[in-house]
Amino acid sequence: MSQMTKRALVASLKDLLAEKPLDKITVTDLTEHCGVNRMTFYYHFKDIYDLVEWACIESATHALAGQKTYDTWQQGFLQILQAVQKDKVFVTKVYHSISREHIENYLYRLTYDLMIGVVEEKAAGMTVRPEDKEFIANFYKYAFVGLTLEWVRTGMKDDPAALIERVSTLIHGDITKALEACRIDK
């Protein structure tokens, strides 16, 4: 029931975003549109931005399910970009309504979790300092988030599959090369 209520609030938020900007939507607007009381909203979320973050995390978690390995990261990122494109109105309105820092922090957390999993997988059998693995994951995190934000900022015109293909071509084998260069057991 709890997840259903959260999803209903997200659906109401998306409907309301079609009518007005995020900063003009109130909790009262949301709860009246959704047919729940304000206490129900506050039981689940501290504010509207918390609801936005939950909606983004929920969408990304669904897109990344089972796609956190070296062989599948491309599919995971493709599914994220496709989900973003599918929700273009929501994403664009949110992108232009809240601080870039808020969006970046969310994307950084999401992308780091994916990349550190890939780095750890490729580092199996190597002795690499944890801070070097983190540095490699952070490097790719910043690259992917920068590309994603630029893609959103420019209206999501590029085909997500073509974008992922270009990124994949650029980094093919580079994570392993970076780990090899950082090995302390050579």
Label the predicted regions.
Residues 3-6, 10-14, 18, 23-27, ...:
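An amphipathic alpha-helix adjacent to DNA-recognition modules
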Residues 69-76, 185:
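N-terminal non-catalytic regions of secreted/periplasmic and cell-surface proteins
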Residues 150-186:
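C-terminal peripheral helix-coil segments that are non-catalytic and often amphipathic
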Residues 74-89, 138, 146, 161:
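Amphipathic alpha-helical segments that line or abut small-molecule/effector binding pockets
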Residues 67, 91-95, 122-125, 151-155, ...:
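Secondary-structure edge/capping motif, primarily at the C-terminal ends of alpha-helices
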Residues 100-125, 131-146, 169, 176:
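Amphipathic alpha-helical packing segments from all-alpha helical-bundle domains
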